[in-house]
Amino acid sequence: MTTFWSQTINRQNGGVATATATATATAATTTPTAGGTGAGTTTSTKGMITPTPFNIDINNDLNDFDGKFIETFKPDLELQKKYRSFIQREGALSFLRTEITQSMSKRDICVLILNLGYPKKAVEDYPILTLKELAYILLKLMLTDSAQLEPKVEIDENDNKNDGTNNSDIDSDIDSNSDMDSQSESGELDDAMDVDDSLSENEDEYDQDMSTTTLKRTINMTPFKYKLPDLISDLSRAKKIMVVTGAGISTSLGIPDFRSFKGLYNQLSKLNLSDPQKVFDLQTFMREPGLFYTIAHLVLPPDGKFSLLHAFLKLLQDKHKLLRNYTQNIDNLEQRAGLKSEKLVQCHGSFAKAKCVSCQGIFAGEKIYNHIRRKQVPRCAICWKNTKQAPIHFGAIKPTITFFGEDLPERFHTLMDKDLQQIDLFLVIGTSLKVEPVASIIERVPYKVPKILINKDPIPNRGFNLQLLGLCDDVVSYLCKCLKWDIPHADFNNNDEFKLSKLKNGDWEIVKKSTSTKK
C-alpha cells in the first residue's frame, strides 16, 4: 500500500522538495529554470535528468522477461542423471535443500525443473509467474513424480514418448489438490521450498546456507592432478579461455569487495539492516531508493582508472586467447580497459547505463555519477514534468545493475551454453563463488578442462585443479613474467620478484616481495 509524505515527494520551489523528518530518501535540491509551468513548478531542475534520445544497445544490462529461452532450452542429460541419482540416495528433501538458495531467480527455478526432466509445458507461463509460484511448481512436480528415482531422458514438447509422461498429466498434477502420500514429507518439503523474494535475514545465515550447498555438491569426480608448470604451458597454447571474475580484481583501486572484513557488507553494518544485502534488493529499492544511494558511491568506479588485472584480461583478448570474460562486477572497468563488448558478459549489469523505474527511459550512466557521489536519488525529468506529488520511488533512476530478485541477462545464459562447448581453460579470479548462478558455472565445465582459481582465499571442494592464492594483480604479474608477456599497465614491472610457497595440497601462495626499477 502506498502512503504519502513520508512516502511521497512533492514539487516545491521549482523542483523536488527536500525530505521531511520522516522521509528517508534524498532527492537533489532544485534550482528554478526558465520555462516553468506554473507557480511552484518547473519543467527542468537540477537533479532531474532527461532520458537519452537515441537507442542504446543494452544487451549486457537489461533483464529477460519474455521467457523465450524455454522454447530453445535443451536439458543437460548428464546433470539430470546426477540430480536423479542424488535424489535416489539422499531423498527429495535433501535435494531441495541443496539446490534451492535464497539468491535463485525465476529463470534458475525453470532451468532446475527442465534439467530434472520435466516438460517445458510445466513452466510455459514463466514470464507471469512469481518466484514462489515457480518454486511450488517444482515442489508439486517432485511430489507427484512416480518415476522420481529413475533417471529420465530428455523431454521435448513434440516427443513425450521418451519417458511415457504426458504434458497434460503434468498439468493435471500441478493443478490437482489430491492428498499427498505422506503429510509429514510434504510439510518438510514445503519448509525446504520456502522461497521468498527477500534474502536471508543475515549474511552469516546466507553464507552458511551456501557453504552447506557447496559441501553437498561434491558429487563431481575428483579433479585430475595439475601443476603450476602445466598452467604456464596451457596459458601459452590456449585459444578459448573462459574467465570468471569478481570484486577481488578491483580492490586495488579502492573499490571494496563484498564479504571480507573490510568489504562492503561489513561497512553497511552502520545502516542497521537485518541483512546488508537488502541494499541490492529490488523490492527494497522500490520502497526506499535512497537507501541504495547512501552506499552507491562506495562501488562507483574511479575516473580514468582500471587495475592491472583488467589489463591482463585485455592482454588475453589481444593475444586472441580470451573466449569470454563473465564478470560479476558492476564497475564496467573491463570496457574501460579495452575489452570488446562481444568478449564481455556483465552477469550482474553495470553502471554503464541507468533506467527510470517508472517510464523505463534509458540514460547514460555518467549522467547520474554526480548524484551518486552526493548520495542523492536521481529522478527522471520526463516523469516529473507535470507531476506535483507521487510515491517516493516515482521517477527514480536505477543503474542497470541486476539486483537480488531480478533475472540475469538472457545473454548470460545464451553465451554460456555455447562457450562451455569450446572452452580449453577455465580461470576464476577474485571471487568467493557465493552468488548463484555464477557460483555453479564450474560444475558445468567439462571434466577435461583445467580449472584454476586465482584468489586471496582458497575455495575448497569446488573441483579446482589448481589454486593460486594471493593478490590477483600479483599472481597474474608472476604468470606473465614466466611467459615473458608484458602487461600494458603502469603497475606491471618485469623486474618484480616473487615469493612462492607450496601448500600441502599442491596449491601455491604467490606474493610480490620487491619492485625494481623498470628497464
Swiss-Prot record:
One GO BP annotation of this record: phenotypic switching
EC number: 2.3.1.286
Protein name as annotated: NAD-dependent histone deacetylase SIR2
Biased segments, Acidic residues type: 187-208
Gene3D superfamilies, alphabetized: SIR2/SIRT2 'Small Domain, TPP-binding domain
PANTHER family assigned to the protein according to its UniProt record, in alphabetical order: NAD-DEPENDENT PROTEIN DEACETYLASE SIRTUIN-1 (PTHR11085:SF9), NAD-DEPENDENT PROTEIN DEACYLASE SIRTUIN-5, MITOCHONDRIAL-RELATED (PTHR11085)
Domain Deacetylase sirtuin-type residues, every copy: 221-486
Alphabetic keyword roster: Metal-binding, NAD, Nucleus, Repressor, Transcription, Transcription regulation, Transferase, Zinc
Main location: nucleus
The UniProt record lists the keyword Hydrolase: no
Organism: Candida albicans (strain SC5314 / ATCC MYA-2876) (Yeast)
GO cellular component, one term: nucleus
Induction line: Expression is up-regulated and increases progressively with hyphal development. Expression is inhibited by 2-dodecanol and decreased by allicin and fluconazole.
Positions of Zn(2+) binding: 356, 359, 380, 383
Top-level taxon of origin: Eukaryota
Reaction equation(s) it catalyzes: N(6)-acetyl-L-lysyl-[protein] + NAD(+) + H2O = 2''-O-acetyl-ADP-D-ribose + nicotinamide + L-lysyl-[protein]
Localization per record: Nucleus
Active site location: 348 (proton acceptor)
Chain positions recorded as NAD(+) binding sites: 246-265, 328-331, 430-432, 455-457, 472
Function of the protein: NAD-dependent deacetylase. Heterochromatin component that silences transcription at silent mating loci, telomeres and the ribosomal DNA, and that also suppresses recombination in the rDNA and extends replicative life span. It acts as a NAD-dependent histone deacetylase, which deacetylates 'Lys-9' and 'Lys-14' of Histone H3 and 'Lys-16' of Histone H4. Functions in the distribution of oxidatively damaged proteins during cell division. Mediates phenotypic switching.
Phenotype reported upon loss of the gene: Leads to high frequency phenotypic switching, spontaneous hyphal growth, and decreased replicative lifespan. Shows also oxidatively damaged proteins even distribution between mother and daughter cells during division.
Cofactor binding: number and manner: Binds 1 zinc ion per subunit.
Pfam family, one: SIR2
Any coiled-coil regions, as ranges: none
Family: Belongs to the sirtuin family. Class I subfamily.
